[in-house]
Amino acid sequence: MDNKYTMKTKFFITTLLFLIGGLCLKAQTNDTDTQKAIATLKEFYKVIYDDNLGRKEEQFLKYVSKELFNKVFPPSPPGEDNSPGYDPFIQAQDYEAKTLNRSLKITSLGNDRYRVCFLLSDWEKKKTCVDYQLKKNNKGKYMITNILSDKNFYIRPKK
């Protein structure tokens, strides 16, 4: 009789250990994905909002989905400018690159959503925050697919 309970106990403990191990592995994967997404956002701001570079479509498309890029920068006929009156990625027109990148703070909001906060200049006291959704592309690289905090550029999920 003791042997029967011992086997059940061993089976229960073994099953419990497998479940705990699986949960730990999933948590590590989620943490790694979060770190990769945050690194993508840091790199985006460093590359795009650098004083020494002119912003080009190719640079944006390394970090921003084509759908979001076309919503933010719609194609316009020659001689016309259909671009927004502000930059939705910084919620402003003007910024100081060094201050912006030095003050950059990125936090995960869960479910592939992230909040990026920064100062636009040294004289600014209030941080600007922008909420994003990032998703992996077919190559496994995180891309900014939505600006959640800007109703002008929010892309409604497809049903």
Predicted regions and their residues:
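Short beta-strand edge/turn micro-motifs at domain boundaries
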Residues: 127-159
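N-terminal leader/targeting signatures
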Residues: 7-8, 14, 65, 69, ...
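Bacterial Sec-dependent N-terminal signal peptides
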Residues: 1-32
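Generic signature of mature, soluble extracytoplasmic domains
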Residues: 42-57, 65, 122-123
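Surface-exposed, charged secondary-structure patches
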Residues: 32, 73-126
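Short, well-ordered alpha-helical segments enriched in acidic and aromatic residues
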Residues: 53-80
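Hydrophobic beta-strand residues in large extracellular and virion-surface proteins
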Residues: 41-44, 104-106, 114-118, 132-134, ...
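Short, low-complexity N-terminal intrinsically disordered segments enriched in polar/charged residues
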Residues: 25-50
